[in-house]
Amino acid sequence: LDIEGNEMSGIHGSLDLIEKSSPLIIIEFSKYIFSKKDNIEYLKNFLDRYDYSIYDTNNKRKNLDNILIKLDNLKKRQQTIGNFYLIKNSSKILEEFLS
């Protein structure tokens, strides 16, 4: 998802699909997304409720606090820290992803 700060709305609108299929979600994390504090809570709740974790493009698991710190440390002109994966912890995709 790269929808200019509306990624949490995109996830919310896809909850039926997420519940049925547990897809791997590619998301670009940016300052735009988390300029709304509600989005931080929404993502935390989503990760907990649907048993998803965040991974970087090097297949390393990240937590949301690390993401927020990384965004906070960006230079003023930079807005994003790139793409990350949201992967359901019990999915076959995770096994394949990490192997």
Q: Each PLM stretch: what is its role?
A:
Residues 1-99:
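Conserved acidic-Pro-Pro-aromatic motif
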